[in-house]
Amino acid sequence: PGGTIFERPELGGISGLAADLLTAGTKRHSESALLTGLDAGGASVSVNAGLNSFLIECSCPRRHFARVFRLLKEIVATPAFGQAEFDREKANRRELLKSRAMSPRAAAEDRARMLMFGGHPYGWGAAGTLPQLEGLTCELAAEYYFSRLVPEQTIFGWGGDCTEAEAREWTEELAAAMPWRGERITLPEQPVFPSGPRTAAIPLPREQTMVLTAVPGPALGGELYSMCEILFQAENGLASPVFKLVREEHSLAYSTGMRLSGGFHPGWLLLYAVTAAETAERALELLEQERRRLAANGLSPEEFNSAREGAAFAAARAAESVGTALNSTLLSLHYGRGLDECFRHEAELRAVDREALNAALTPYLSHPSPVQIMAGRLPNRKEV
């Protein structure tokens, strides 16, 4: 139970900072010795803190598994959380946030999050904010990580060259090494969305301008997950309606697309375009035009059929990859869904009906309180 949604306001961004520190040394091995040992075993270890989850992944050749597993146990059970490594990673995060503030795309999305979600954790996103970062300490990062280790909310998964008996044995061994905590982690209150439209203009010394329009969306961990995947597939890529409208028909953007956000709690549906200052206002109008079209008419039969096929193909490919299937299965269980969802997902997507999809998503796409952002080089009359 980690990730942004489980952070308190004063700890925004701490999940990502803790994730960076897990592979920066253990109680027994320095960072250099740990990385050397993993490299000698041909291992790849990644720790990812997202909006709704905290995921530790490790892969290696079977012949090196025993030695790598010993190091993995140290990483998850006895990470060092050294002060020097913390200071380094905090400095890296500080530079990341400063870089985001100067990027039209990142700055626009970060401001949109704040306006859309307010004080809910989704409002500060996975990176957190600079004021939140400055309040974080090494002790807080360590306590946050260890407080996540709740047995009934932790999921272990194994895949590849192993038997079920071996997987059970490794699970028991890893569980025995964990410094478990007993207090169950609970979700915060759901976000309260704006009662009216919100807008912002962010001047930045860049040549390009990012424009976006966003409306409240469904919880992506829920029953609308497959429908949102099809909508996402439809509105991204060179054949998407928004690309054809904004770029091909009006030559107003370098790139366009749709972003989805959410998970345990409702998130957003966001349409964006990267354009120039002179065409930013018109590009934003066209994004709103596309949103209203989707709200009124939904995806056309051609758009729907193509998008559903693309989403189903991606699901089939994911089920064929051990790593991707294992990752998807763990997240499915994390959200309280079925163990075999990854292997049923292609069929679930193909079973989605166009009229049902359009009817289900219309209330979100027609929401009366969009958030609209313009960031980068602005039209002359635009001010913050």
Tell me the role of every PLM-derived stretch.
Residues 1-23, 29-78, 90, 94-96, ...:
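M16 family metallopeptidases and their MPP-like homologs
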Residues 44-47, 142-149, 259-262, 360-364:
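Short, flexible, solvent-exposed loop/turn segments with mixed acidic/basic and small polar residues
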Residues 66-67, 164-168, 223-224, 278-283, ...:
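Short, conserved charged micro-motifs
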Residues 138-174, 193, 369-370:
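Non-catalytic, conformational "gating/processing" segments within enzyme and secreted inhibitor domains
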Residues 140-143, 185-187, 195-201, 216-217, ...:
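Glycine-rich, charged/polar anion/phosphate-binding loops
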Residues 168-172, 180, 206, 213-214:
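Acidic, glycine-rich loop-and-beta core segments that form the ion-binding/anion-interacting portion
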Residues 358-374:
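Bilobed periplasmic-binding protein-like "clamshell/Venus-flytrap" ligand-binding domains
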